[in-house]
Amino acid sequence: MHSPHKIKSGLRIAFLTSFDPSNKKAMSGVSYYFLKILREQFEVVDIIGPAKTRKVLNGRINRLLRFIFKRKRYNLDHSFLMSFLYKFEFEHKLKGKQYDFIFALRASTEIALLNAKIPVVYYSDATFKLLYNYYDWFSGFLKLSVAEGNKIEQLALRNSSVCLFASEWAIKSAVEQYGCDPEATYLLPFPPNVDHIPEIELTDKSRTTGICNLLFLGVEWERKGGQIALDAYYSLKSRGIKCSLTICGCIPPEPIEDEGINVIPYLNKNLEVEYMQFEQMMLNSHFLILPTRAECYGIVFAEASSYAVPSLATQTGGIGSVIKDGINGFRLPLEANGADYADVIETHFSDYAEKYLPLSRSSRKYFEEHISAEAIGKKMVQILENTLSKKQ
């Protein structure tokens, strides 16, 4: 729990962002919750943003570029044009201000050309090279656009005194593909998108009804492996295991008629009533099952761990830095099917006291020690203060 009299670091931080960090929906809530951590740890945290330049993305220039390049895709978001516009806007905003560090979250284009004479801390969960062709929506760009994107990434990393990444997967790319200094590159998980962490007593799953409650939580049915999760549920049922499946965040493409399946198309965590519904759903779950096809990190796995819910996902992207096998869940191969997931669930749930409960409790313990807002905040302060002491 946070102490009301916590002594904060005296470092002065500029939180540079082109988005509005007060908006929980911007950047999937990462900027909102990370700003919260910064304010808990540092005395001075000023927001340098949002940027007017971002409006260009939806304005006349973007429409003009789409007309010029027709169906070929030009990624304006990672372009030198945007980087120059950001440079002038942010240098103007920073003029005459004194800070120990500029904190740039997922802001490679914003800082690539920045000349602020203040050490920059860059924080992300991926590099341009990792993203390109990994996600369907981040593919098929013009060669010029790919070249610009890679150069922007390289300049941003070179322009940073400290590089923080949410996964070892991203660190490897930054160091090996972009020449990032390994001595100034650190692993720092992304914070969970929750306003308060449930008391540990509430997450205790000692009492059981004998029904295994599965949770599929995601907005993209196909990319998140919805059909595999559904197959796992049916596989468990065919084995005579009592179970339920809650599908939250999307609607399956085919209608499902099964009394054990509950579909919640959308929950708005900004609304108190729906947040309480989300919380109850998490507290009632035994496993989060998300056989995702592509994932840079997966904040939802950290959220599940905070509720002592083990996660079952795939070995892809940066998931290995948030799910530790046998500690807070398991990562299965991408080709694993529903029956494979059902095997893992059955093994643990059928031996509830000896296998499931220890996994549930170690999920919460791992969360508190490594991926909670408090653990992330402490590690970040340590990294920045050590960086400053090396320079003095």
What label would you give each PLM region?
Residues G249-F287:
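Nucleotide-activated donor-binding/catalytic signature segment of Leloir-type glycosyltransferases, i.e.
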Residues E199-K224, L230-S235, L245-C248:
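Conserved donor-binding/catalytic core segment of Leloir-type glycosyltransferases
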Residues E354-H370, K379:
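A short, well-ordered alpha-helix in the C-terminal region of glycosyltransferases
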Residues P310-T314, I323:
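Short hydrophobic beta-strand element within catalytic cores of glycosyltransferases
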Residues W169, P191:
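Carbohydrate-associated surface elements
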Residues L142-C163:
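Membrane-proximal helix-turn-helix segments that form the acceptor-binding/catalytic region
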Residues R293:
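Aromatic "clamp/platform" in nucleotide-sugar-dependent glycosyltransferases that forms part
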